[in-house]
């Protein structure tokens, strides 16, 4: 059974599908907590399809989000701390100020999203897809990212992107645009990193750009 969930202000609309036909539909008026968040914590949300223009201020703490799709323009100010996120697809334009602290799962698809101020620290997201993402001011410290792909991702932060103490075994950073980063104390066995240098041309601070890349490479372990 598929559940299609639409979130609008305080109201959650749920349609239950069986064999591609609507079996029933319900609307729920959700109370918000003191911080103004809709609380969807500690729930089994397997096979849900979340839809909406903007999904904002929803708490998914410790919820089961296996085989879930988020289809919306934007997800903002949401919290997925300690959630299970196996086979989750984010068909969004932008994730802004979203927390994935200590989430666990595999095959999470963020491809072609703008990830703006997203905290992935201490999460386990093996075999995940960050292809063609624009990544700004986001944190990947202490992550397990085994065999994940960042192909043609753009790291656009003014400050360095941090992967400190992360497991980056077999991770592909293929043709990324990246001039700052910190890979201190990472596990980098079979890691592949190729940088798209096209930003060099026309860069006003060419010396600074090159120095930042050198500093980033210097943080890689000797066996990288």
PLM features: residue spans?
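Tandem repeat scaffolds
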Residues: 2-12, 17-224
